[in-house]
Amino acid sequence: MRTETEEIRDNLKYLSLLARDYPSQAAAASEIISTQALLKLPKGTEHFMSDLHGENEAFVHILNSASGVIREKVDIVLGDTVPEGTRAELATLIYYPNEKLPQLKERCADEEALEQWYSETLLRLIDICRLVSSKHTREHVRACLPSSCGYILDELLHAHFEDHDKDLYYGQIVGSIIENGRADKFIVRLCELIKRLAVDKLHIVGDLFDRGPRPDVIFDLLMRHHDVDIQWGNHDVVWMGAAAGSPICICTVLKTTLAYHNHGMVEDCYGINLRHLQRMAEQFYGDDDLTIWMPHTDTARGPYTPGMLHRCAVMHKAITILMLKLECQVIDRNPDFKMQDRDFLRRINWEKRTVMVNGREYPMRDMSFPTVDPADPTALNSDEKVVLQKLVQSFRQSEKLQQHVEFLYAKGSVYHIENGNLLYHGAVPMTRKGSFAVERFEGHAYSGRALMDYCDERARRGYFAPEGSAARQSGQDFLWYLWCGKLSPLYGRSAMTTFERLYVEDTSTHTEVKDPYYTWYNEEAVCRRILAEFGLPGASHIVNGHVPVQEKKGESPIKGGGRLVVIDGGFCRAYHEKTGIAGYTLVYSSRTMSLRTHQPFESAEKAVNENLDILSQKNILETENHRILVEETDEGEILREKVHDLKQLVRAYQLGWIKETRCDDSVW
């Protein structure tokens, strides 16, 4: 066993780098004291959400309201002394300060009334901010303050009143803020600070893309968030492949986008040019019966003209047939995927107008395939090649899409472990006997955690491997497999029956059989075995998304004796009728783990104008027997290592092995 001095000597190179930040004993000792104090604070509040599916307005509201936490803080501070309507207005002001502030100011009859409202509002916001900042260090709060008004806000939040009257002190500062025309700015800054301090960490358990109108807005918000991680969903990885330039992934995301009449987002927000696709679609399919190709529509986003629906439907058909050709090519290149039964263009009997599905023959609903050569059904014609080339170029050159996908890679992974919670979107593939399913890729067998790690590594190849390399091609094909493959941990079903739903009338072929995991995760022993596979004790939790919980049918999101929580509650508007709710937020604070069930959100406009909030029901899952401190978290482990390193640095200074560059006791 090495002595302390031997360990310090071995770490001298690292300690010399650390000395750049702490150039003296005093500086290092001061940081040790601050860090050790931080360890004794309550752990920060973590929020978990999943399956956002582009529902930007509902997501923005839940983010702004901290899933109802901020309204709770408003009620705690103001209590019954302030009417319900006034508390609702104040909560809305915190959620949407830039939109709500002008409305509230207009109601003031004169300058005197406005000044009175300013004073009351600022004082109330200060009290709420003091409450949400109470479990943060002053240094942390100060770091969150805007430079333009940070000093004054720091004074208002941390003033002590042993030596002077609180009302007089606050009154003087607030009066000066109003007198100098800075009230609006301070109100907005306080609202933003309250939202910033209410939630420490945000975990998004997959599926940000598809179905909803504006995933780009969600990404822009997340990229500005102070601490977020993402566990990829199958709807995410296929967009990652599209951004990387994978033809099959590009066709797949466009097929989904057109199926939900959301191509406006692709064109206007990501700048993807669909003109060549539309021209080809009209050329080959413009006169077809497009009944089965009509998109899903949302009356809240209408109205839709016949011309709009036709344009969408004809492109939907064109991109689907192109996608089916490319699927066959990917399946041919990757026998490891074991998806040979999904090459449907080869399974069509062109004379009998039938198709073989799972060993049975079914009549086809649509037999118009003008771009398909029955002798070579997977070959692209010249027009399709041009369209595909233009689409790949457009996806690769979309600056915003590249930014969002790079963010997904930087902040995302197949799974994430933090503070005793295991997070993943889909499933840990299992057999019907309850063991981890084994799959072979590239000559090696993988199961359980090893399979998840392999999927993560190969998914990164698709974007980061050198252009034109076999590794990049392999990675892009695998991103498509993660979207729909039988043993994909992100999909977790036997097959994605897109072809059957479009072309086969018999609904028995539409079934997507869930992985046995979704039966076994009801067993506590199995959940504990999954946790053990990832190095976690049995008292930990699994946080899962992907499969909407049908609360309206009595299904519970709590599985496996409380070891697993499914947090896909149908956030997407398209699932509200199926689930009976509009999503969940799992909240893990220093005292409890609770699940908040959200009701549908009408609109941001109504939220601002009528103070409408998302109604949420809070269900306590676990209550801690003591308040969890930072030292008990993963962050605490990192901070303890930091203290250890700093103590070694102090000792290295004392031994003279590292020279102090600044001897300044003023840091004390």
Predicted stretch roles:
Residues 1-668:
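Feature recognizes metal-dependent phosphohydrolase scaffolds
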